[in-house]
Regions:
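Active-site-proximal or metal-binding-adjacent scaffold patches in catalytic folds
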Residues: 1-56, 65-104
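Walker B catalytic acidic pair
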Residues: 61
Length: 104
């Protein structure tokens, strides 16, 4: 989906990172993932989420290019670019199930 690529291309320079392939899949257990090779994968259902939530997930996965973990340093990287990330995470916890009810 062009939406995901354009948002990743927008946010990557803010984080000082690059990425390789970007795939949008029918993921059921993860919203997104980042491989050590820099490949990004996202659930197509994120296209149904509010734009700030989609952007948070993209920033989250791109941040793994700097920190391949969920350490304090990782969250500092996310926070520097997406200071509202906690509210976006809450939105996903509250509304994520409804996104999974959507059919392609």
């Amino acid at each position: 989906m062009p939406l995901f690529r354009s948002r990743a291309e927008y946010w990557a320079p803010f984080l000082g990172v690059t990425f390789n392939r970007l795939s949008v899949k029918d993921q059921r257990t993860l919203w997104g993932s980042c491989t050590r090779e820099g490949n990004l994968n996202f659930s197509w259902r994120l296209a149904l989420a509010p734009d700030p939530v989609l952007d948070y997930l993209i920033v989250h996965e791109l941040s793994h290019r700097a920190q391949m973990n969920h350490s304090r340093r990782f969250w500092e990287v996310v926070e520097a670019v997406c200071p509202g990330h906690r509210s976006h995470r809450r939105w996903l916890r509250k509304n994520g199930r409804a996104l999974h009810l959507a059919q392609r």
